[in-house]
UniProtKB/Swiss-Prot annotation:
Pathway(s): Cell wall biogenesis; lipoteichoic acid biosynthesis
Any single Gene Ontology cellular-component annotation: cytoplasm
InterPro entries: AA_adenyl_dom, AMP-bd_C, AMP-bd_C_sf, AMP-binding_CS, AMP-dep_synth/lig_dom, ANL_N_sf, DltA, DltA-like
Cellular localization per UniProt: Cytoplasm
Gene Ontology biological-process entries: lipoteichoic acid biosynthetic process
GO molecular function annotations of the record: ATP binding; D-alanine [D-alanyl carrier protein] ligase activity
Name of encoding gene: dltA
Organism of derivation: Bacillus thuringiensis (strain Al Hakam)
Protein name: D-alanine--D-alanyl carrier protein ligase
Length: 504
């Protein structure tokens, strides 16, 4: 598959087909090509001998997609940066990435960034003044050059830039289109922010098949009336989200085939798909196919998939996450470094062309997590699991990294920033489960000196500081105050004891 050519052919074959819809804003495939060509031409003229990554800032605006393609046509990887990301984190991404340019689809509220900022109005001028110019196709990202870089949570308190190459993305997109039986011209739900790699599961499968991306933003999700009004208008056929989002939608009785009569495929990734959620979806959407998938950001969205049928639901209380895509393989490694036999638990290691080339500017972290096996890139996921007859079963994290509502995060990163807050002497983050998956974060805090008469005022002050350093989804929902943190005999935090205390 030639990814960019495959997207561009729709500008010729179906130029007036809508490529992307967000609220009242939409773009056609013709506009997508013209504007991304104009932007790529401008980037190449301004930065002729430069291939540094470009930050793309915004939320669900159509210009985000234009900017992504404009960057890669000019030979630059893009770094999606959502509006919700705190200023301090945006600053660290800018510094770590070496980006020189930020393209903005929304007002940039972050100050003192070490990059040139192209505003919304500047972008419109570029689209207009460079219209009709086409970039040199030889300049476009290709092969093992980075296509995008997504920053994920890092245990040192600094985010890690996962580098995904053109070849990685082609491998994923081709597999997704074929294995999920995606058809030409379908409407895809775009629910995940672009800084979250789940969004890649809908963006590129939609664009290469001439589909329409129907974007749901965070304000809609916070207002169910607006959300379901949008869904009713959408005629979505391919649903891509975390299981949590679908579970929330199922709380609305009208969320069914009557609301979305042409629903064909549910694609789930990012967290555990509960058996009962899949069962309800089959009841509400009897004609739709439900696919459960698995994969970390470092292996390009997902590398396994399984069609969840009623037979699968009856056979497995905890659902398997699927069979590996044909160009990759899974190894289950025991602690001694040997390969575990069928049915035995160990660390999931992914081998093949889906695997990232590593973390940008972080050779030590890259060496720790990535290796070569039989001449192919391999990623040590830190996930526990086992394989039985080719089917992968996921058993949670081996370390303190978790997925909460689809967002992957390092508990140590949150603890790092929490301990840096005023009024905090010590802190541990405890993820609280509801059934099979994590429901919320609890912060166990040893407070320092403070003058607050009520605990809720202390909590408000700590949360205010955290909001300046971490995304909202990493802020603990509840706080518990103790005089000390329990320790193990070897001097480490006794997390098991702490969990038993807080859940007793």
């Amino acid at each position: 598959m030639k990814l960019l050519e495959q997207i561009e052919k729709w500008a010729i074959e179906t130029p007036d087909q809508t490529a992307f819809v967000w609220r009242d804003a939409k773009i056609t495939y013709k506009q997508l090509k013209e504007d991304s060509d104009a932007l790529a031409h401008w980037i190449s003229s301004e930065y002729p001998d430069d291939r540094s990554p470009i930050m793309v800032y915004g939320h669900m605006q159509p210009e985000m997609i234009i900017n992504f393609l404009g960057c890669v046509k000019a030979g630059h990887a893009y770094i999606p940066v959502d509006l919700s990301i705190p200023a301090d984190r945006v600053q660290r991404i800018a510094e770590n990435s070496g980006a020189k340019l930020l393209l903005s689809a929304a007002a940039v509220t972050v100050t003192d960034l070490p990059v040139r900022i192209v505003s919304e109005d500047n972008l419109k001028d570029i689209f207009f003044t460079h219209k009709g110019n086409t970039p040199n196709p030889e300049h476009a990202v290709k092969g093992d050059e980075n296509f995008y870089i997504i920053y994920t949570s890092g245990s040192t308190g600094n985010p890690k830039g996962v580098q995904i190459t053109y070849n990685c993305l082609v491998s994923f997109t081709q597999w997704a289109v074929e294995d999920f039986n995606l058809q030409t011209g379908q409407v895809f739900l775009n629910q995940a922010p672009f800084s979250f790699d789940l969004s890649v599961m809908d963006i590129y499968p939609s664009l290469v098949t001439g589909g329409t991306l129907w974007a749901i933003d965070k304000d809609m999700i916070a207002r169910p009336k607006d959300l379901f009004a949008s869904l009713e208008q959408s005629d979505i056929q391919v649903w891509t989200s975390t299981p949590s989002f679908a579970e929330m939608c199922l709380m609305e009785a009208s969320f069914s085939e009557s609301m979305l009569p042409n629903m064909k495929t549910f694609l789930f990734c990012g967290e555990v798909l509960p058996n009962e959620v899949a069962r309800k979806l089959i009841e509400r959407f009897p004609k739709a196919t439900i696919m459960n998938t698995y994969g970390p950001t470092e292996a390009t969205v997902a590398v396994t998939g399984i069609h969840v049928t009623e037979e699968v639901l009856d056979q497995y209380k905890s659902l398997p996450v699927g069979y590996c895509k044909s160009d990759c393989r899974l190894l289950i490694m025991k602690e001694d470094g040997t390969i575990a036999p069928d049915g035995e638990k160990g660390e999931i290691v992914i081998v093949g062309p889906s695997v990232s080339v590593g973390y940008l500017g972080s050779p030590e972290l890259t060496e720790k997590a990535f290796t070569m096996i039989d001449g192919e890139r391999a990623y040590k996921t830190g996930d526990a699991g086992y394989v039985e007859n080719g089917l992968l079963f996921y058993n949670g994290r081996l370390d303190f990294q978790i997925k909460l509502h689809g967002y992957r995060m390092e508990l140590e990163e949150i603890e790092h920033h929490l301990r840096a807050c005023s009024y905090v002497e010590g802190a541990v983050i405890v993820p609280i489960k509801k059934g099979e998956k994590y429901d919320y974060l609890l912060a166990v805090v040893v407070p320092g000196e403070h003058s607050f008469e009520k605990e809720f005022k202390l909590t408000s002050a700590i949360k205010k500081e955290l909001n300046e350093r971490l995304p909202n989804y990493m802020i603990p929902r509840k706080f518990m105050y103790q005089s000390s943190i329990p320790m193990t005999p070897n001097g480490k935090v006794d997390r098991k004891k702490l969990l038993s205390e807080v859940t007793a």
